[in-house]
A protein has these predicted regions:
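N-terminal beta-loop-helix "entrance" segment that forms/cooperates
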Residues: 42-59, 154
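Glycine-rich phosphate/pyrophosphate-binding loop and the adjoining helix
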Residues: 2-4, 8, 49, 138-188
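A generic structural motif
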Residues: 32-38, 138
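A general structural signal for well-ordered alpha-helical segments in protein cores
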Residues: 7, 20, 24, 60, ...
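Helix-loop-strand module that forms the ligand-binding subsite of alpha/beta enzymes
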Residues: 55-136
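N-terminal beta1-alpha1 ligand-phosphate binding loop
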Residues: 2-33
Length: 188
């Protein structure tokens, strides 16, 4: 079997009991063998400041290296005020700068938005996609992943307990794996 593609999973929530972090862990356990998922933490990143471009903070350099080393990126995000959380936008900015040296460039991406509400983070999902287009990240278009009603989605072990949602996520992950194979750069 070929070496699994490395997928950086970026969770857009810092909350300790985050539904999005639970989702990231659940999909890690569900991922097909062709993908190796790793959650890349964003909570330690300083706010992006262009004045630091010549000598970026160590945390920013380490984060950017992890993104650069990945074959693809999977964003798992909540919705705050019909958009992405500030911490996620900051992480995107940190790894995209200085201009022309983006770690995101050309990396296939997927977006899963997770919410306890009925619309499953629709606003955040679409707003994030706009930024990813600018960053030259080919984003999986179908299936779109809006996971609503997430408050009672996970069992005590952290697995997805709703059969319909599990089936959908299996379909999404299979499509994402195929997308990564079609659009990622050839392994070195």
């Amino acid at each position: 079997m070929a070496t699994p593609r490395r997928v950086a999973v970026v969770v857009g929530s810092l909350r300790k009991d985050s539904l999005n972090r639970k989702m990231a862990k659940a999909i890690d356990a569900m991922a097909p063998p062709s993908l190796s998922l790793e959650i890349v933490e964003i909570g330690q990143l300083p706010l992006y400041n262009q004045d630091d471009d010549a000598n970026p903070p160590d945390a920013s350099v380490a984060f950017k290296r992890k993104i650069a080393a990945a074959d693809a990126v999977l964003f798992v995000t909540p919705e705050y005020n019909r958009s992405v959380p500030g911490v996620l936008k900051n992480a995107i900015d940190v790894a995209s700068r200085p201009y022309g040296k983006s770690a995101w460039d050309g990396k296939p991406a997927g977006v899963i938005s997770v919410s306890p509400g009925a619309i499953g983070g629709f606003g955040a999902n679409h707003h994030l996609r706009q930024s990813l287009v600018f960053l030259n990240m080919p984003v999986l278009q179908q299936p779109e992943a809006y996971v609503g009603g997430a408050g009672d989605l996970f069992d005590e072990a952290g697995a997805v307990k709703k059969p319909d949602t599990k089936k959908f996520l299996d379909t999404f992950l299979a499509a994402f794996a195929a997308w990564v194979e079609r659009t990622a750069k050839a392994p070195a």
